[in-house]
């Protein structure tokens, strides 16, 4: 017996290997899945007969789910139902259990239920998943009358009438979307359960089976549920997803459903995609994947809506006329006749204008969605060059209402891609990294959504400055159009900001926009990264930085538009990207630039700014009873840079702590004056190792450093400030944890022994799949006798501690650091000098670069 099972197991293995070979040679996937199902039939029937379950009328073996539909994937579960009569003996039940054991022994992943017809029907009446799988059952062996009885007992006359089943499946899909629609699943989508995945196809078949009593979706054409073209589209989507799923199972050697990063690379190679100069093979493959699930989801939405409107609520219509072409039916817009778009193609865009103009419209009727899809061919060259068309499109952004829902629908129905060729190019475009969580088209629409949110009261508390600015914005449509085009040239190679500006220029000309409006839109696209790069990479407390930033703004009003676009862009890139620290940096840059642009700081140089801050801090300290002379003596040792970086309140607090201290080092951990991060302030006798010690301790406490300012005072004391965030990129709220870090820093900085060891931590699973080549560039700052070191590399635990050890070894002095992490990519800026206090020479730069690359490569653990 065991020998027989071993032979069968080997036969299954050989058959699957042959299938994989056929699949690799591009055999039709429908044929592959059906062949596998039929082959498994023979194995199961053989085992069923072997266990003598086929005699008489006591048992019936049924295939369920995808197996019942003859759609078996390489490592899919084999869902079985064994029905038996009420009077079956214990010995016969034991044979049924032995049959299941044999299935497992031969290597079949079997999920099973052994039960009576009445018990199964009772369970189906309470469980949506059970009734759904039963509807796909297929007789394999045994007494067929048992299956017929189950069909009768689970009929819509007895349970789950089609409207009840429809709403239950709709809720099930919404729950699935909520679970699998998160960012992580967008980066590594679930091909089976994710939005637009195979489940979206199966629900269409299930509800049509339940209502129309059909066996195949193609039969729904005769009922008007689906058109021939829509059926062909769904078949295309299904075959694409089946091929990807079969290949995924084959490569994983198990029932893997998630397109994780490592499998994305392997699948792209398997399907023959090749890297190009401007786009990776994996990005091409995932673009095709996202376009398929977008189309699949769009069809799913339209057909479910059609079922709801036509079958469930077909007798409950309230009609309100909008104009000669459109009307509302139960608050859903629809055409008044099916010739509207053919007679006037511009009405396609006009429909979406109505959606923006009338926010009370809940959506578009399914029949009209179908008509839009069938009319896309009308949006040709003549359509796009029409002045009437241009006016309607621009007016979508000029109503003063939120255009997001209308634009989202235009994207889903294919209208945006047909109207703007450049938008079609980025539809489905994904970047292979951890930073960009969405496709370019979806990110673009999220940026527009975020801009609209700035106007809404419920977001005013989260974005108070944005809310204030946008209410005074003269022409919001300029901001929306800047957002629409800001990433339009992604994936082409070259600078997407420059290429996008060219597209924006052509768009504004074609849409007859005023010269000043056109200039601002083009500028926004060209410089949409300016504000975030300045805030995160440069010293925004340096008046020269503000001056250089403002010189790139042609007019003061450009700042308002740029700030709003920057915040919306960051928030729309990745849900985890926006935090209080970025918020505070951008606000400080905005306010500093606003002041400079309005000439309020025209005559204030560094010395004047320092003098003002000193005076404010002095007033605070004197009011607390500290003498003027004591304060002056201490401040006389500080460098002017310190007073530029800190607020008067923080300067006063630091000064009091130093004057009241009885031992060194002085370590203070407190909220940063912007409240966006946590500040670590250290004052102690000069020690070359202090930066290395501090970064090592902070790394061991799992905090991230955002900025560092390192100052050696004239009295040979070190005055350093760090801005840190916790693991969630937020300021510290846990006081005990702050005290623990403070104590650890004090202990190690006071210790004259060895440097603290950096605890080794594994890279996250996601980070292991990316390899950012380490790049190091130097720029000499002759004014300050410093060298700017710009480092790009893979993110990893303890990276800054590794860099600090290299600086220490080579006697490199750090003056300032700006730390920026974008997904797996780190972009850090260090302001350094050699041990004599001057910029690095060529030889020193070469040695430093080689040492950094070596140590960083060794630290990837």
UniProtKB/Swiss-Prot annotation:
Q: Spell out the molecular function terms from Gene Ontology.
A: [protein-PII] uridylyltransferase activity; phosphoric diester hydrolase activity
Q: Residue ranges of region Uridylyltransferase? A: 1-321
Any single Pfam family the record assigns to this protein: GlnD_UR_UTase
PROSITE patterns assigned: ACT (PS51671), HD (PS51831)
Where do the record's region annotations for Uridylyl-removing lie?
322-678
Superkingdom per UniProt: Bacteria
The ACT domain covers which part of the protein? 679-760, 788-861
Which keywords describe this protein according to UniProt? Hydrolase, Magnesium, Multifunctional enzyme, Nucleotidyltransferase, Repeat, Transferase
Q: Which InterPro entries does this entry report, sorted A to Z?
A: ACT-like_dom_sf, ACT_dom, GlnD_Uridyltrans_N, HD/PDEase_dom, HD_domain, NT_sf, PII_UdlTrfase/GS_AdlTrfase, UTase/UR
* UniProt catalytic activity: [protein-PII]-L-tyrosine + UTP = [protein-PII]-uridylyl-L-tyrosine + diphosphate; [protein-PII]-uridylyl-L-tyrosine + H2O = [protein-PII]-L-tyrosine + UMP + H(+)
Residue ranges constituting the HD domain according to the UniProt record = 440-562
Q: Which SMART domains match?
A: HDc
Q: What modulates its activity?
A: Uridylyltransferase (UTase) activity is inhibited by glutamine, while glutamine activates uridylyl-removing (UR) activity.
Gene Ontology terms: biological process: regulation of nitrogen utilization
Give cofactor(s), names only.
Mg(2+)
Q: What is its EC number?
A: 2.7.7.59, 3.1.4.-
Tell me the function of this protein. Modifies, by uridylylation and deuridylylation, the PII regulatory proteins (GlnB and homologs), in response to the nitrogen status of the cell that GlnD senses through the glutamine level. Under low glutamine levels, catalyzes the conversion of the PII proteins and UTP to PII-UMP and PPi, while under higher glutamine levels, GlnD hydrolyzes PII-UMP to PII and UMP (deuridylylation). Thus, controls uridylylation state and activity of the PII proteins, and plays an important role in the regulation of nitrogen assimilation and metabolism.
Family to which the UniProt record says this protein belongs = Belongs to the GlnD family.
| Entry remark concerning the domains of this protein | Has four distinct domains: an N-terminal nucleotidyltransferase (NT) domain responsible for UTase activity, a central HD domain that encodes UR activity, and two C-terminal ACT domains that seem to have a role in glutamine sensing.
> Which protein is depicted?
Bifunctional uridylyltransferase/uridylyl-removing enzyme
Name of the gene encoding the protein in the UniProt record: glnD
């Amino acid at each position: 017996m065991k020998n027989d099972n071993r032979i069968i197991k080997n036969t299954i293995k050989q058959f699957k290997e042959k299938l994989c070979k056929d699949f690799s040679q591009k055999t039709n996937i429908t044929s592959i899945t059906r062949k596998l199902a039929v082959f498994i039939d023979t194995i199961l029937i053989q085992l069923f007969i072997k266990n003598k379950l086929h005699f008489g009328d006591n048992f019936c073996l049924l295939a369920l789910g995808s197996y019942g539909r003859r759609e078996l994937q390489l490592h899919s579960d084999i869902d079985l139902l064994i029905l038996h009569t009420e009077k079956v003996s214990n010995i016969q039940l034991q044979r049924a259990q032995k049959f299941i054991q044999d299935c497992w022994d031969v290597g079949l992943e079997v999920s099973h239920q052994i039960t009576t017809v009445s018990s199964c029907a009772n369970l189906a009446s309470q469980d949506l998943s059970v009734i759904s799988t039963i509807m796909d059952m297929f007789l394999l062996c045994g007494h067929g009358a048992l299956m017929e009885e189950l069909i009768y007992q689970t009929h819509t006359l007895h349970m789950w009438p089609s409207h009840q089943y429809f709403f239950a499946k709709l809720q099930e899909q919404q729950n699935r979307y909520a679970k699998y629609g998160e960012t992580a699943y967008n980066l590594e989508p679930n091909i089976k359960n994710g939005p637009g995945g195979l489940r979206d196809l199966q629900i269409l078949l299930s509800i049509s089976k339940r209502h129309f009593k059909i066996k195949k979706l193609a039969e729904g054409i005769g009922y008007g549920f689906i058109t021939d073209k829509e059926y062909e589209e769904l078949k295309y989507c299904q075959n694409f997803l089946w091929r990807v799923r079969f290949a995924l199972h084959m490569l994983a050697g198990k029932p893997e459903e998630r397109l994780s990063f490592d499998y994305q690379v392997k699948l792209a190679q398997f399907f023959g995609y090749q890297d190009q100069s401007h786009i990776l093979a994996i990005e091409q493959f995932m673009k095709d994947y996202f376009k398929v699930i977008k189309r699949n989801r769009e069809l799913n939405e339209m057909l479910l809506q059609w079922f709801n409107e036509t079958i469930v609520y077909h007798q409950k219509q309230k009609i309100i006329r909008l104009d000669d072409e459109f009307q509302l039916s139960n608050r859903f817009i629809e055409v008044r006749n099916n010739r509207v778009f053919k007679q006037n193609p511009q009405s396609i865009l006009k429909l979406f204008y109505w959606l923006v103009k009338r926010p009370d419209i809940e959506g578009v009727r399914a029949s009209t969605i179908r008509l839009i899809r069938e009319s896309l061919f009308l949006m040709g060259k003549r359509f796009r060059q029409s002045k009437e068309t241009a006016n309607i499109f621009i007016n979508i952004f000029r109503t003063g209402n939120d255009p997001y829902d209308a634009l989202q629908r235009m994207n889903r129905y294919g209208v945006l891609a047909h109207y703007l060729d450049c938008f079609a190019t980025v539809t489905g475009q994904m970047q292979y990294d951890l930073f960009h969580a969405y496709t370019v088209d979806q990110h673009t629409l999220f940026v527009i959504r975020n801009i609209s949110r700035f106007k809404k009261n419920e977001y005013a508390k989260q974005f108070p400055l944005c809310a204030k600015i946008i209410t005074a914005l003269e022409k919001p449509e300029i901001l929306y159009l800047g957002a629409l085009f800001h990433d339009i040239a992604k994936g082409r190679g070259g600078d997407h900001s420059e290429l996008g500006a060219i597209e924006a220029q052509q768009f504004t000309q074609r849409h007859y926009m005023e010269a000043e409006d056109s200039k601002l839109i083009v500028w926004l696209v060209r410089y949409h990264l300016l504000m975030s790069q300045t805030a995160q990479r440069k010293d925004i407390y340096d008046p020269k930085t503000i001056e250089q930033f403002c010189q790139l703004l042609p007019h003061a009003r450009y700042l308002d538009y740029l700030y709003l676009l920057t915040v919306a862009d960051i928030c729309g890139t990745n849900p985890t990207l926006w935090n209080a620290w970025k918020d505070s940096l951008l606000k400080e840059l905005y306010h500093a630039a606003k002041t400079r642009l309005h000439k309020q700081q025209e005559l204030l140089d560094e010395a004047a700014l320092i003098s003002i801050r000193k005076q404010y801090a002095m007033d605070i300290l004197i009011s607390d009873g500290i003498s003027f002379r004591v304060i002056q003596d201490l401040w006389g040792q500080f460098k002017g840079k310190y007073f530029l970086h800190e607020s008067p309140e923080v300067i006063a607090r630091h000064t009091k702590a130093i004057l009241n201290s009885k031992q060194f080092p002085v370590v203070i951990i407190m909220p940063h004056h912007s409240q966006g991060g946590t500040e670590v302030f250290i004052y102690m006798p000069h020690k070359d190792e202090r930066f290395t010690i501090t970064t090592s301790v902070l790394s061991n406490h799992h905090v991230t450093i955002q900025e560092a300012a390192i100052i050696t005072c004239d009295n040979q004391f070190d005055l350093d400030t760090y801005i840190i965030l916790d693991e969630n990129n937020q300021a510290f709220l846990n006081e005990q944890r702050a005290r623990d870090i403070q104590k650890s820093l004090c202990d190690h900085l006071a210790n004259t022994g060895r440097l603290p060891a950096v605890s080794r931590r594994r890279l996250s699973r996601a980070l292991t799949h990316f390899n950012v080549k380490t790049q190091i560039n130097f720029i000499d700052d002759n004014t300050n006798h410093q060298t700017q070191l710009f480092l790009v590399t893979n993110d990893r635990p303890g990276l800054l501690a590794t860099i600090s050890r290299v600086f220490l070894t080579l006697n490199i002095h750090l003056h300032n650091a700006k730390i920026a992490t974008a997904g797996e990519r780190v972009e850090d800026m260090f302001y350094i000098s050699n041990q004599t206090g001057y910029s690095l020479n060529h030889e020193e730069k070469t040695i430093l670069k080689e040492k950094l690359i070596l140590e960083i490569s060794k630290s990837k653990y």
